[in-house]
Amino acid sequence: MKTNGQIQLYPVLRVALFLIAGIVSGELLYGAVSCDAWFAATAVSLMFALLAYRRCVLQTVLIFLTCYFLGAMLVCRELDEVNMSVPGEDTAYSAVVVSQPVVAGKVVKCDLITVNTHRPMKIKASIYRDWRADRLRIGNGIEAVSLLEKPTNYAGADFDYARYLLYHGYVATTFIYIDEWKGAAVDLSRLSVVQRARISALVFRDKLLQRFSDMGFNGQAYAVLAAMTLGDKSSLSDELKEEYSVSGASHVLALSGLHLGIIYAILSLLFSRRRWQIVSQVLILLAIWSYVFIVGMSASVVRSAVMLTVYSFVSLLNRNRLSLNTLSVAAVVILAGSPLYLYDVGFQMSFAAVLFIIIFYRPLLEVMPGSIRNIPIIKQIWQMTAVSVAAQIGVAPLIAFYFGRFSCYFLLTNMI
């Protein structure tokens, strides 16, 4: 079969591109075009696509239009959820702590989810510090009366902090004074199954972190160990983050694809018998998702687990595991579940890195003459170099755009 262009070799890539285009359009037109309008457009285009089964070209166009409208509808719906009306006045509410409380001067900062409002609200909270606030842990319930406000930007800041909070699910911010709250047992039944599961996972992770402290880890050693193994970066100091960022190794502290990939590779070596391939892949994926649950089901870890799951299923079909289609399937699954991930820096960087490895790894590998490249030690070093350079080609523009810097030590750091 002939194809009129290389892109037709990657059908899922086209679906992903139209879905992304729809998400971008839906976000830009939010407020001007309603979710109902996007839903109607999705339904109509899907109906015509089903009716046009005898006209392949027309049906293909209509399917892509359906993906476009679907992306717009999904992002519109998610924006509706985070753009809830906030009272803007002192409000009484019950909530549960859903992030590791962090001491910052005279306040303790943490995330709360309300459990007695019409819809649960995720709140970025600052609690005036006292002995009770210092003892707050993930999963603790509180009853409070405080001013709930929509996220706003800091005066004179270039970074759009309000947009960042909204796109990460925060509905409001609040400051809680000493006499405005008390600990309480709260009912979590109004929360979704996913929210309750995540809270349970975070409570379990908190117990594991306490084990690290009991074993004698403290200071920077504890902070790095907690970040690399359980994804808790709350103890990392700004100085330590800066050192890792300058050295080009900040990705080591962000529990994501690198760490899950190592776990997947080790488990694959342990379960390498070919005749038990299906069983071994199921066991490996169960282990991966169990780990995702233990570390709190953060966005970056879930994203990486989805990519590994797609990779695993593709390997069972004896297809090219690391291809544009595989990457596109992962993108479609993730964005269909949470379209605002598209605006997450971690999402953009992880997919850019994998995309450029797929595109540039082989050409970079062949830059070195085969007679030299086939020497075992040189081959291994050059393969690592090619992967690192290809990934950096993809993420360098994003790093420069978002952080205004680029590490020149990435090759040496990644080798180590």
Language-model regions, residue ranges each:
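Alpha-helix C-terminal capping segments
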Residues: 49-52, 84-87, 112, 212, ...
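N-terminal leader/targeting segments
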Residues: 1-84, 173-176, 196, 200, ...
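Membrane-interface helix/helix-cap signal primarily in integral membrane proteins
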Residues: 2-5, 64, 68-251
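Hydrophobic alpha-helical transmembrane segments in multi-pass membrane proteins
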Residues: 14, 22, 55-61, 174, ...
